[in-house]
């Protein structure tokens, strides 16, 4: 990350995009955790980029030892009010942080696309922070989500992997697909043991937010979108890798 960036400002909603949609918090966070849970290891947890701690809260029942690294001081202050002493927060850039132990579970959710030099940070995960038998959970927005492909056909976005102006204001640097995400993980020395998508998604986040205010969408429909996403990972809202240290 670039020390000249204003990470507090990047958290703010802008005219083209909210930073957090209800769809993210109430739907995607549930299915992200559901996707990760079978792969959790016993031990501690490091979350890379915790923002205000909204997703962090879902890990409390599963881990007693949680550390979060976050670049935004404002986000950390809000998160500390939420968790008190339950979570250890470190205000730092990933490039600069010094950690005094290794972690059995490391989670990075919708953060890698914000980094100026993602491979260097992934190398730190592999070489410095991940325990020998630990697992790294990496989730990013998907360039090939149908909602995004439809936006391209509508002329709203130039191409699937484009970074929109609204995304740039939120600090996005690139938009990953499964192949580009996996390649960067491998370039950093990580061993990808599992890959999938999370939640088939044909509507934009703001459209989902409107639908969720009605009785049109049922829990069964949401579960159906999740299950369909397992069959068609390249057409999901998010893409997901589980990685371990390369044993070679």
Predicted regions and their residues:
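Conserved N-terminal segment of class I S-adenosyl-L-methionine
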Residues: 1-101, 105-109, 122, 197-198, ...
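S-adenosyl-L-methionine-dependent methyltransferase catalytic module, highlighting the catalytic core
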Residues: 3-7, 16-27, 54, 74, ...
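A generic alpha-to-beta junction signature in SAM-dependent methyltransferases
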Residues: 83, 129-132
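Short catalytic micro-motifs in class I SAM-dependent methyltransferases
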Residues: 110-114
């Amino acid at each position: 990350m670039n020390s000249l960036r204003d990470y507090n400002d990047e958290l703010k909603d802008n005219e083209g995009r909210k930073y957090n949609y209800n769809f993210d918090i109430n739907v995607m966070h549930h299915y992200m955790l559901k996707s990760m849970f079978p792969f959790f290891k016993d031990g501690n947890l490091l979350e890379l980029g915790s923002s205000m701690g909204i997703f962090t809260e879902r890990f409390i029942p599963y881990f007693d030892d949680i550390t979060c690294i976050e670049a935004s001081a404002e986000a950390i202050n809000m998160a500390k009010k939420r968790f008190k002493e339950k979570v250890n927060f470190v205000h730092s850039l990933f490039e600069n942080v010094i950690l005094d132990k290794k972690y059995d579970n490391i989670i990075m959710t919708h953060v890698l696309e914000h980094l100026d030099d993602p491979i260097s940070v992934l190398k730190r995960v592999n070489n410095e922070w991940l325990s020998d038998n630990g697992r790294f959970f990496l989730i990013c927005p998907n360039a090939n989500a149908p909602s995004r492909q439809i936006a391209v056909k509508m002329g709203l976005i130039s191409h699937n992997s484009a970074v929109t102006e609204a995304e740039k204001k939120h600090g996005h640097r690139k938009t990953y697909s499964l192949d580009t995400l996996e390649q960067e993980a491998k370039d950093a020395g990580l061993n990808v043991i599992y890959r999938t998508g999370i939640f088939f998604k044909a509507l934009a986040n703001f459209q989902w937010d409107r639908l969720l205010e009605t009785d049109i969408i049922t829990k069964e429909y949401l579960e159906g979108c999740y299950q369909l996403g397992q069959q068609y990972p390249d057409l999901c809202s998010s893409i997901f890798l589980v990685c371990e240290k390369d044993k070679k």
